[in-house]
């Protein structure tokens, strides 16, 4: 059994943290990807993403390239989309039947209550721990706000 960092990242903020966690813990890493990719234009993604989130539209995802049963620890990374988990992550969680999970959430000023969101999406999944990692808004070149030392200290607990 081992660790898996599983993440969804449209603009690479979440991906950068996922890669850091995998590198520092020796975990495997896998990306959650939509069947139909989002456009590359930020404004278009924001419009589509907000519509999906507001209307609770589940975006179909590609089959994962890993077998979740081989891992005793799954670390899920996601950005905040309009105070919620992105539709791709909701699609994953509603079908994954995980007993427990560790969650990290990146945001650019829009917070997410991880416990409430996980109870809403996957009420039978126990959240072992969670971490909120903040970046500057995406409308400018996005930069990490949460100190790396704080992130690394959390990673050491994994």
Show the residue positions of the predicted features.
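Short, glycine-/small-residue-rich phosphate/pyrophosphate-handling segment
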Residues: 102-146
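N-terminal beta1-alpha1-beta2 submodule of the flavodoxin-like/Rossmannoid cofactor-binding fold
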Residues: 1-76, 83-85, 128, 149-158
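A generic local structural motif
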Residues: 59-65, 88-94, 115
């Amino acid at each position: 059994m081992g660790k898996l960092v599983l993440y969804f990242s449209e603009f690479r903020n979440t991906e950068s943290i996922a890669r850091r966690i995998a590198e520092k813990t020796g975990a495997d890493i896998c990306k959650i990807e939509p069947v139909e990719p989002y456009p590359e234009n930020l404004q278009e993604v924001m419009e589509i993403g907000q519509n999906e989130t507001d209307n609770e539209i589940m975006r179909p995802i590609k089959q994962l390239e890993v077998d979740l049963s081989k891992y005793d620890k799954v670390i899920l990374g996601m950005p905040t989309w309009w105070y919620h988990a992105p539709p791709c992550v909701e699609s994953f969680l509603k079908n994954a039947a995980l007993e427990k999970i560790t969650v990290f959430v990146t945001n650019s000023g829009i917070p997410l209550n991880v416990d409430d969101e996980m109870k809403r999406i996957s009420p039978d999944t126990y959240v072992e721990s969670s971490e909120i990692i903040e970046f500057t808004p995406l409308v400018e070149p996005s930069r990490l706000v949460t100190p790396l030392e704080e992130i690394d200290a959390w990673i050491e607990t994994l």
